[in-house]
Structures are given as structure tokens and as C-alpha cells.
Regions:
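Immediate post-signal peptide segment of exported/extracytoplasmic ligand-binding proteins
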Residues: 62-68, 246-247, 251-254
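Short helix-initiation/N-cap motifs at beta->coil->alpha
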Residues: 2-13, 93-107, 112, 116-127
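Pocket-lining segment of extracytoplasmic ligand-binding domains
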Residues: 99-107, 118-204
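Hydrophobic residues within well-ordered alpha-helices
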Residues: 15-16, 244
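A conserved helix-loop-strand patch within extracytoplasmic ligand-binding domains
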Residues: 43-103, 148, 155, 172
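Secondary-structure end/capping motifs
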Residues: 176-243
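Periplasmic-binding protein-like
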Residues: 46-55, 141-174, 217, 221, ...
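Beta->alpha turn/N-cap motifs
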Residues: 7-9, 19-31, 36, 41-43, ...
């Protein structure tokens, strides 16, 4: 058994290229390639309400973003699709989505983007999607005069479902050929997850001075996320898949499957 470290986008590419047999994957990349993959049971990253680390920060209310330029981070495709679904289906707007790298500049108000100019490439951004630490900081201390919105909370409020951001998956061919190995790895990962959750308060205290954030905030963040994958997460993933189809980021609803000892079982 060999462990391969890597950022999420690299791990996504490697399992799809057959360079990895089992890997965490972003939800949208799993859904786009579900025919060749199987879900590992009871492992994932989800929220059932606030997520605290995915935020839309806007200089205007989200219902006023129609035609406005909205920056979407290039580091999280799942969050990108989530933002599109919420903006189009729940807030009823169709912004101009602008891919950008993390650490970009500030926002401009609606007066800086007149209707005659707001689709030009040089126009300023009116809203931006933040991921990870920047989102955590923005939601902790919102900038005055902005709308700072937790997208996990909005998803659950509008749909009633939890939001699944990442799953653990195995290549289907590998899972069918080596079911015992997949089951063993699943058990190891589950035990590691449980140990990490027990150590979450200590981890929060260690990270607090490095991140310049209160330990209580970090501990709340760790406890807010859900790290399992059961029926509620499956329902949430299916709901997200439906939204992704409707906004054009998924061609069709995939047939989902998960691994079990000795077989690949359909996830109904």
C-alpha cells in the first residue's frame, strides 16, 4: 500500500488517470465520472447547515447580482457549482461568472458596474466566492457594507438537504477485483477519522496561533463538518447532482454505486 499526498485537484486527476486506486474526490468530479467509480461507505465531507469555509461576499444583496461579475475561485469546482445553483435557482439571478485565482483584489459596488459596461472583461467584481481560511475569516468578521453568506447554510435552508463537498472513491475496476483490500482501506480510514475527531480540540489549540484565529472558532469549525456518508449524505449528493444538471455543469444524473465487501452495491 502506497500513500500519495496531493492537493484535491491533483488527486482528482490521478484517480481518473488510473494512477491512484482509492482517493478523496470533489463531489462534482466524482459525479462527472461516477460510471468508473464507487463510493466508499461512511466517509466524506459534508455540512448540514453552516459549513463556515465557503462564503459568497458581495457588495450588493445576492438578489441584485443579475448580470454582475462574480469571481469564482479556481481551487474548488464543487463550490463553484454550488454557488451557481444558489444564485440561479434560489436568488433568481444570472451573473457573469469570472474564474480567478485565490488572493485577488477587492469588490466594487453596483455604481462601479453600469449596465452598459458590466459584461466587459475589465469591469470590477461585485461579488466573490471565498474558500477555506479566507471564507472562515470573512464569516467570522464580516466586512462592513458587504453581504457575507455561508453557502452551506443557504443550501440546507433552501433544499432541506445536507451538502456533500467531497467523497472517498475507488476505481470501479479495482473495487471489483480487490474488494477485500478496499474494505481494509475503508476500515483504516474510518478509524483514522474517528481518532482525528477525538483530537479535534487539541488540534484547534495548536492551529489557533498559527492561523491567528480563536481556538474556539476552529474547534466549532471542525465539529460543524460531517465526515461520514450515510443515507442523508446520499440524498444530499443526489440533490446536488440534480442542481448541477440544471445549471449545465453535469450532463445527466449519474448512477451512483458504493463498495461493499465482495461486491459493488447500488446506492439507491
Amino acid at each position: 500500500m502506497h500513500l500519495q499526498p496531493g492537493v484535491p485537484s491533483a488527486l482528482n486527476r490521478q484517480i481518473l488517470a488510473g494512477e491512484l486506486d482509492i482517493s478523496p474526490m470533489s463531489s462534482i468530479e466524482y459525479l462527472r465520472n461516477a460510471a468508473d467509480l464507487c463510493l466508499l461507505p461512511d466517509l466524506g465531507i459534508a455540512s448540514d447547515g453552516p459549513v463556515m469555509s465557503i462564503a459568497l461576499v458581495s457588495s450588493v444583496p445576492p438578489t441584485s447580482l443579475d448580470g454582475a461579475r462574480v469571481g469564482l475561485t479556481s481551487t474548488s469546482a464543487t463550490s463553484w457549482v454550488l454557488a451557481k445553483i444558489l444564485l440561479r435557482e434560489w436568488w433568481g439571478v444570472s451573473p457573469v461568472f469570472v474564474p480567478e485565482m485565490p488572493g485577488a483584489g477587492g469588490l466594487h459596488g453596483p455604481s462601479d458596474s453600469s449596465p452598459a459596461r458590466k459584461n466587459e472583461a475589465t469591469d470590477p467584481l461585485v461579488a466573490r466566492l471565498l474558500i477555506g481560511d479566507p471564507a472562515l475569516r470573512a464569516l467570522w468578521k464580516p466586512e462592513p457594507g458587504t453581504w457575507t453568506i455561508d453557502l452551506g447554510q443557504e443550501w440546507t435552508r433552501h433544499t432541506g438537504h445536507c451538502m456533500v463537498y467531497a467523497v472517498w472513491a475507488a476505481r470501479r475496476a479495482y473495487a471489483e477485483r480487490f474488494p477485500e483490500t478496499v474494505a481494509e482501506v475503508t476500515s483504516i480510514l474510518t478509524q483514522a477519522r474517528d481518532a482525528g475527531l477525538r483530537d479535534a480540540p487539541a488540534l484547534a489549540r495548536r492551529l489557533a496561533p498559527l492561523e491567528n484565529l480563536p481556538a474556539s472558532l476552529l474547534e466549532r469549525y471542525f465539529s460543524t463538518l460531517r465526515y461520514g456518508f450515510g443515507p442523508r449524505e446520499l440524498d444530499g449528493l443526489n440533490a446536488f447532482a440534480g442542481g448541477a444538471v440544471r445549471v449545465g455543469d453535469l450532463p445527466s444524473l449519474p448512477h451512483l454505486a458504493w463498495t461493499s465487501p465482495g461486491a459493488v452495491a447500488t446506492a439507491a
